[in-house]
Amino acid sequence: MAGHSKWANIKHKKAAADAKRGKIWTRLIKEITVAARLGGGDADSNPRLRLAMDKATDANMPKDNINRAIQRGVGGLEGANYEEIRYEGYGINGAAVIVDCLTDNRTRTVAEVRHGFDKYGGNMGTSGSVAFLFDHIGQFIFAPGTPEDKLMDAALEAGADDVITHDDGSLEVICPPHDFAKVKTALEAAGFKAELAEVIMKPQTEVVFTGEDAVKMQKLLDVLENLDDVQEVFTNAVIGE
């Protein structure tokens, strides 16, 4: 299946992540803690914990930090009790935005997220107002030059739904979220290391922004992403060059 260019966006995302590693560690510690609390401290039987631990390792987080977060989650250490909350809303020009949070203070978080939407012309909607515009998937992005046929064989055998070839030569493997850990392990065993591997809300259609609208929409997304309680921001907005 063919698709449009992804590689520049992936490289930008990785560079941005490297630039705010301290914040990423904080988010990952929260995610590890919640994953361990909900599914137990054994990563082999807890796919969500395995994914969070893999992300933490990729972000160069020390093992001690990871283990402490797991212990906090299973009740071995004291710490904040985080609650998962999803907010949905619209940016300018009807672009859909999903904001996933982990918080120990729902009142604070909803006020900050609402302010983020309002500040740059967006508005926060009700639960379910935009989620139907996205698909919940596991996603793996591979660099241009990755052998397509071999990757496709390994991915489909592992249980992936699709392999997409983008115009820039990068490859995208899509799988059901509940099979993410299994597919990731199988691909790595076959010698394929993804540049980006995550469970996401993927937009079914996109809204392309250019000029001043692009600047304004990017500012809205940046404000939301920089909130302390925000774990992930998903949008169907595509910011043009």
Swiss-Prot record:
GO CC terms in record? cytosol
Q: Cross-referenced InterPro entries, in alphabetical order?
A: Integrase-like_N, TACO1_YebC-like_2nd/3rd_dom, TACO1_YebC_N, Transcrip_reg_TACO1-like, Transcrip_reg_TACO1-like_dom3, YebC-like
Detail the disulphide connectivity of this chain as listed in its UniProt entry: none
One Pfam assignment = TACO1_YebC_N
Q: Which UniProt keywords apply?
A: Cytoplasm, DNA-binding, Transcription, Transcription regulation
Kindly list the biological process annotations in GO that this record carries.
regulation of DNA-templated transcription
Q: Which domain of life is it from?
A: Bacteria
NCBIfam families according to UniProt: PRK00110.1, PRK12378.1, YebC/PmpR family DNA-binding transcriptional regulator
Task: Report the protein name in the record.
Answer: Probable transcriptional regulatory protein Rpic_2388
GO molecular function of the protein, one example? Answer: DNA binding
The organism encoding this protein is Ralstonia pickettii (strain 12J)
